[in-house]
Amino acid sequence: GIDDYGIYGVVAGLITMFGFMNAAMSSSTQRYLAFNLGLKDSIKLQQTFTTAVNIHLLIALLSFLLAEAVGLWAINHLLDIPTDRLVAANKVFQYSLITFVFGIIQVPYHAATIAYERMNVYASISIVDAVLKLIAAYLLLMAPVDRLVFYSQLLAAISGISFLLYFVYVQLQLKEMVIPPQNHSMN
């Protein structure tokens, strides 16, 4: 109901307000990758990609730790959440945090796809993401469980699927971006 909508908006909002970071990180990572792609130096490109992956893993870890410390405190002590929905609010926070972490670690793979101008892949994954979110919204109508928690679980799963699609595509199709590095010539 109305309370659940408000809880989701506030709790997930604590995490998603940092979503602007993903756009900025993706744009800058894409620029570095595209620049090195233009140099046609596969070693430099691989180093740049590996560095981007490592930086984003570190950012994800630090964000996770900070959110666990500050976010949980805010939910349990600062926000005015009905007592009977506090457990659900904590679960929503955890699933929203998972969604956020997947978003961060997806950035280098998304940026590599864009840097290589594989817009068909980007569009396909975006369509899959949108369709899965539509299915998630429909499943809420039939859910015999706490819909607030179920929705946040579905969004976390969709975020994981989106990450996996980018990860698998990059690892299989963009040979210069394989982790660990392998010796390949530029396409």
How does the language model describe each region?
Residues P82-Q106, I135, S152, G160-I161:
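Alpha-helical transmembrane segments of multi-pass membrane proteins
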Residues G1-M17, T48, L148-Q153, N187:
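Interfacial/gating helices of multi-pass transporter permease domains
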Residues I98-S126, L139, V149, V170-Q173:
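Membrane-interface junctions at transmembrane-helix termini in multi-pass inner-membrane proteins
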Residues G1-I2, F18-L58, I75-I81, I114-V121, ...:
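Transmembrane-helix boundary and interhelical linker motifs in polytopic inner-membrane proteins
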Residues L148-L154, Y166-N187:
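Interhelical loop/hinge segments that connect adjacent transmembrane helices in multipass membrane
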Residues G9-L37, H56-S63, F100-Q106, S162-L165:
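Small-residue-rich midsections of specific transmembrane alpha-helices
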Residues F64-T83:
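Short membrane-interface helical motifs at transmembrane helix boundaries
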Residues S124-R147, I161-Y166:
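Alpha-helical transmembrane segments of multi-pass membrane transporters
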